[in-house]
Amino acid sequence: MTTPSMEDYIEQIYMLIEEKGYARVSDIAEALAVHPSSVTKMVQKLDKDEYLIYEKYRGLVLTSKGKKIGKRLVYRHELLEQFLRIIGVDEEKIYNDVEGIEHHLSWNSIDRIGDLVQYFEDDESRKKELKSVQKKTENPGE
């Protein structure tokens, strides 16, 4: 079972490896705005729990278990961003809102949000209808 903090690290490591082909402690620390010693401590825990393989001074690689979870965590994050965009959340608020909610939703809830996103993506008129409803509730009496 992963904690929210472990998930943040796995997600970031997965994204760095996808983007650069590798993830160093310094890159992870910079991306998460934490001290490198905190990264080393967490990486050692993730190694012990078999999410990655870490060799001091040599770098790290995600295990198949780590890759699977990393991919799912990135999907969750991107899906929630997409959902918040569809429902009209201000762009500058989306990242922090996703960070605030992503660890508190069950995978069942994530899957249902995915269904809802798909529903809106399948037919552009549904998005327009939602915007129309939002306009009415924001400006009652118009």
From Swiss-Prot:
Assembly, in brief, is: Homodimer.
Its recorded name reads: HTH-type transcriptional regulator MntR
Q: Which organism is it from?
A: Bacillus velezensis (strain DSM 23117 / BGSC 10A6 / LMG 26770 / FZB42) (Bacillus amyloliquefaciens subsp. plantarum)
Q: Which gene encodes it?
A: mntR
For the ligand (Mn(2+) 2), the binding residues are: E11, H77, E99, E102
The domain of life is Bacteria
Location within or outside the cell: Cytoplasm
Coiled-coil positions are none
**Activity regulation information from UniProt:** DNA binding is strongly activated by Mn(2+).
